[in-house]
A protein has these predicted regions:
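Phosphate/dinucleotide-binding and metal-coordinating scaffold of catalytic cores
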Residues: 1-250, 254-342
């Protein structure tokens, strides 16, 4: 809403995106991707703090998430074709611990435009675009397996997700991979899909907890005009509560633009795993409760957006029962809780 289609000059606020509008800030790498960009700049004897938003977007060029591209393109990486996941994971660990890496060029080329805290690369698998994640320095070494198990559980809960795989490793149980939902193969070409995160739409920082699922429900209805999309968001909220996914910040919810229908829809869910946020609470509150949300809080959120109590309760119980079967009874949730607090 900060950029309506009117012939006027609009000046962005400095906060929260350092002088960028949300739609463009979404293209900028954060977390791991920004770390790679800054390390590459330092290697070229450039102070990262002196690089403004426009130049950072030029570095993203045509490699960013979603459909937006930026010109002119600043190229500061080389390209390599061979991908060895264990070796790249080892280089990721080096970068997280120090500024040295033999494969900084390759890692930047593969993951320099990605967001999120965990190391990741953007790559091709069977000719299609995928994201492959590696453990961060404080992660359980088998976090890839856990995220894969979470993805299987989410799908059984009725949550839409892109295709996921557990990629083989000799160092751990495997690396988590997911097909990109902002790229679609069409008649031998790759079509880029417009996407916007909730952070970009509402222009709020994902680093500061400021949202409630009540807001997400209203936003989903306003953008999509479709109650089935609202129910998708509700189901995702239930899942996040029951599986202890508390890093549910504003960049972990995204909408895709459907050019054929001329409207927005909720993107497939992503970044679903055992996690905590600031103070161990949910980054997005459930009816004001981020610490210990209960079924009563969940049902109030549903009621406020107009989902019937019977349907809301049925969805919540179905999700909870599936989580119990797939993650609780199998010990996966308990093991992750132990891993976090040992």
């Amino acid at each position: 809403r900060s950029l309506p289609l009117q012939k006027k000059v609009y000046i962005p606020k400095i906060v929260p995106f350092d002088g960028a509008f949300g739609v463009f800030a979404d293209s900028l790498p954060d977390g791991w991707g920004r770390l790679l960009v800054d390390r590459m700049l330092l290697r070229e004897h450039i102070n990262p703090h002196e690089i403004d938003i426009l130049n950072r977007l030029a570095i993203v060029g045509e490699t960013g998430m979603g459909a937006l591209t930026y010109r002119p393109v600043h190229k500061i990486q080389s390209e390599k074709a061979q991908i060895e996941y264990d070796r790249l994971a080892a280089e990721c660990r080096r970068i997280l611990e120090t500024e040295y890496s033999n494969d900084l060029d390759e890692l930047f080329a593969l993951g320099g435009s990605s967001g999120g805290a965990r190391p990741k690369i953007l790559t091709k698998i069977d000719g299609e675009d995928w994201i492959v994640k590696f453990p961060a320095s404080l992660d359980d070494p088998n976090i890839g397996l856990v995220e894969y198990q979470y993805s299987l559980c989410a799908k059984k809960c009725g949550i839409e997700m892109a295709e996921t795989r557990l990629l083989p490793s000799r160092q751990c149980e495997g690396y988590f991979g997911t097909k990109r939902f902002d790229r679609v193969a069409l008649n031998g070409h790759v079509k880029r899909i417009h996407m916007l995160s909730v952070s970009a739409i509402l222009e709020v920082s994902h680093r500061i907890p400021s949202l409630d699922y009540n807001t997400l429900m209203v936003l989903t209805l306003e953008l999509t005009k479709d109650y089935s999309e609202v129910e998708k968001m509700y189901r995702l909220m239930c899942f996040n509560v029951f599986v202890h996914n508390r890093d549910d910040h504003s960049k972990n919810f995204t909408f895709l633009y459907d050019t054929e229908k001329g409207g927005w829809r909720l993107a497939p869910a992503y970044d679903l795993t055992y996690s905590n946020s600031i103070g161990g609470e949910h980054a997005t509150c459930i009816n004001g409760n981020g610490k210990d949300p209960a079924l009563a809080d969940i049902l109030i959120v549903a009621d406020k957006i107009g989902i019937s109590k019977s349907k809301a309760k049925r969805i919540a119980e179905q999700v909870q029962d599936t989580v119990n079967d797939e993650l609780v009874k199998t010990g996966i949730l308990h093991n992750m809780r132990y891993s976090y607090f040992r």
